[in-house]
């Protein structure tokens, strides 16, 4: 019977395909009631929400080995997001569907970087995006760059809480298509009009994200003034309602941390659905601070972002939605309106629905109902890979994006698929119980070598959790080190090394791997780390770190910068690094980390990593 198990699964898969094809639908359909475009009680206005696309236009192609068979499938991609939107437009009529994005759409993916953001701009123009706000990573670019993109857009960029101090402009401070808010007029088939007011909000980068004028392109934003979120929302909402808005939505880059176990279940949600709680652990959560003080009736819904988590939740009776990063999902908020006795359309808040998270997939795993990258072991729980349909229509590459493929794909593929290096000599990349990590150590050694630094240290998050021995392409290097990060060096004393490393290891949740350092740590019962001793490897031999001696430290711009929220931006580490940055003593490369690393490993052929974790020369040593 066990031997027959794979064949039974194949037979079941064949039956599913046959039944689906007989019904005219290829694959799995949803097991919930969808919103009827011709509902007799309400006029529904669908609002599509995406956020944190981070420049990922093309899908990621995954390969997993199941026995002797290799499964190939795609994860994410705007070609599938476009298909959902156009199916929805067919159902409701294009005039009734609105599409908004919550920001962070340029910075990240190789396609956006390679083509200077143009591929993202072209997509939003072609698909007919109605509006966006800007996220914290839009501030990574020079202000003139963002303004040029906004001015070329066919949609509105909505940011209400800013003003340019030099020109005193509010509307238009970010370019020709920048508005503080906008009323979208939806003409119904009976010629009635429903007005949706949308207010854009972004982070106060000089407060919430601590944007200094010393790091890279962010100096070009120095003349920007940020207003209070609450005051701006209340005043603008009142203004929009006086202008006839039947509902007011906040388009933001704010998000919540919510329980993802329940949240990732695809369903049609309402305010009484069990969705999984959202947590108030993050004391810096802008959205919770806003929700705690906002008055009822100011905002009817929120499109968010930033946390890279699924959100289809109601907090303080306000529906909110955001999705995980990299164009892997989208949500749809359905706003129901009903005419009152005076003939005015009133939003029926209690009947608002959110459909999602909708997976951007042409194939999904039957049980998990998504197309995330999984291991061969996880395949048994995820279920067989089947074609996917939504509302009776197959999800596939929408033909509207074909001109963008014709324009960009060949050049992208040629660049991305360059072979750089083959890593071997290990079963897989993993962190052992000491905190040492093979891939971390490999890259940190390279960074120290490139910059001829005494040591290098970077947070764990920059490296993937797992990697099997393989040949890495140019795209692999980029994906492991995205966001245009750069290698930076700074001279520090031995005493400063102890303060910096002591801070980041004690306040951080994960280990900070390093090159040429031995960090001896104690961990208490609560998991809190304490650095007991730091020593330096010089030509393989341990040396004491001398307090008044100068050493060259290498790290990344993102990790060192106080904008990152990383542990370098805390305590004594912050005081040391921030002062050196102000004094222009932090020197950053002109090239990005992925460029420098690809150049470093190019031509090395096969690299054996078997000795990158050496028990006799530990980099992180846990004192029992």
Could you tell me what each predicted segment is?
Residues 7, 15, 21-357, 434, ...:
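Acidic, metal/ion-coordinating pockets
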Residues 15, 24-84, 90, 212-230, ...:
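Catalytic centers of hydrolytic enzymes
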Residues 1-10:
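Classical Sec-dependent N-terminal signal peptides that target proteins to the secretory pathway
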